[in-house]
Amino acid sequence: MGKIIGIDLGTTNSCVSILEGGAPKVIENAEGDRTTPSIIAFTNDGEILVGQSAKRQAVTNPHNTLFAVKRLIGRKFKDDVVQKDISMVPYKIVAADNGDAWVEVKGEKKAPPQISAEVLKKMKKTAEDYLGEKVTEAVITVPAYFNDSQRQATKDAGKIAGLDVKRIINEPTAAALAYGLDKGKGDHTIAVYDLGGGTFDISIIEIADVDGEHQFEVLSTNGDTFLGGEDFDMRLIEFLADSFKKDTGIDLHNDPLALQRLKEAAEKAKIELSSSQQTEVNLPYITADATGPKHLVVKLTRAKLESLVEDLVNKSLEPVKQAIKDSGKSISDIDDVILVGGQTRMPLVQKAVADYFGKEPRKDVNPDEAVAIGAAIQGAVLAGDVKDVLLLDVTPLTLGIETMGGVATPLIEKNTTIPTKKSQVFSTADDNQTAVTIHVVQGERKQASQNKSLGRFDLADIPPAPRGMPQIEVTFDIDANGILNVSAKDKATGKEQSIVIKASSGLSDDEIQKMVKDAEANAEADRKFAELVGARNTLEGLIHATQKTVKEAGDKATADEKAAIDAAVKEAEEAVKGDDLARIEAATTKLTEASSSLAQKLYAEQQAAGAGAQQADGTGKAADDGVVDAEFEEVKEDNK
């Protein structure tokens, strides 16, 4: 069995790790970076760029450069948070046929799992390049507060990328694994505050030493799947755009190119203000009007940035309060606070967390890498390479069904340890009712319609009977990934109906298979592209070398040789401009043949000249050779 890799599929950045010789290792990508921007670009010549290369060209290709797509995964187009995002991103968010939020690139609608799969493919390739072997299995992390649809959609993304997802693991739990694996004996309770690029999670986790085994038990989890560094960036973008509008009367929101430049500048300024008190945002030629070009120059202080985002930081403390309450612990019971996610580098965030918990957060956990490392540890546990770790995670939201009057009746309460199975008996609402619809919902609201609808199915052929008489047993079964199976059984007839809750990514198995094939086709296209570029480079090198040879040969080249080479070079120069691999290879062969006789002639002359020079040098060479020959003392013995 190959290695099971750990992937942190982040909103802003992604990271891949493995366990090697018992120690976790974060793998550097082809660019030499330990994290990869979760940015995907579709270029005009049909190439798909992922990571730094996509980020670099974002300003010139804003409509087809996708970022923060994880925020759309498993969401409906009409969700308020999606609607808010539409005006803030330069690319197009559209409604899929089933009402999901998808993106549109070059006139083609694409599902978020399909886009995320491109990032996962890059992570897979990074691991394969390092290991020198094929990778097919992975543990992928998700925000703890992801609902069932979002988890299923993440699993779909893995499948599209050609990965068998062995486990979906919560990000704070993964960070706790990374933190707690090397800690000594004894029990301690930690809070993992995870503020990433697009999501926020808080988990209260108990690490216990049970018979020499590290037991990680999640006591409670809470969060907000639409609160993260992207929101901090957007506050700054809004401020810069408003300042510019006040000064010039021009609204930059209508200019995707300007919006993309603003985004990059806002992110850069935010990062700089974590270590300095003031910075300047300077964007020359941001736009133009009838009076000429306009420049954006704004001095920004840390205090100003903090005033813009203070409410976002405070917003993160509400889930923290709830998680502590749900865990049955008090703040004084928390031994350590772990910060995860790039946004926790902001001094205001660190201060808010320290003030709330009454202690400084730990600084010995890398906020960008801890989650991927934890995923790799979980992968090693599943592979049997790590034996002394037991992980007890929880379901983040209450699961139930809609009952009479539109009430949400819970079957599995939030923060229940998973995997778990729970059954409850329900009955009919009307006399002689022969079918019931089981509507599965997820959330904390009492009214079913206010919660997330996960799916519905019918149990038919119930024998007619007075209301309340038939006994219908509904069973909820959550696996270790937090993914739900629901079944309903008529106890009188034994008739059963079940449903695996599918992602609201709305992707059927056929669609996923099609996307897998598309991804494979892309891989084939990428291979052909690399082959074409390689052939082109070879031919260009040959043209240059041949021209240099002809120049150096001067009169030694006959008129026929020169004519043949000139014709072959012209043909090669034409071929190298195109995309026809066969033509490029044919031109390479022709040019090699045309120039080979001249090259051989020159080589023979050089050899002859070299041999002549050696002969002219005669026996004096040995004496002049210097140090090496002088070491042979035997020479002196001839003179005895």
Curated annotation (Swiss-Prot):
Residues the record lists as Phosphothreonine modifications: T199
Bias (Low complexity) ranges: 606-621
Pfam families per the UniProt record, alphabetical: HSP70 (PF00012)
PROSITE patterns named among the record's database cross-references: HSP70_1, HSP70_2, HSP70_3
Location of the region described as Disordered in the Swiss-Prot/TrEMBL record: 606-640
Keywords: ATP-binding, Chaperone, Nucleotide-binding, Phosphoprotein, Stress response
GO molecular function: ATP binding; ATP-dependent protein folding chaperone; unfolded protein binding
Biased amino acid composition, Acidic residues: 626-640
UniProt induction comment: By stress conditions e.g. heat shock.
Function noted in UniProt: Acts as a chaperone.
UniProt similarity note: Belongs to the heat shock protein 70 family.
Protein name: Chaperone protein DnaK
Organism: Cellvibrio japonicus (strain Ueda107)
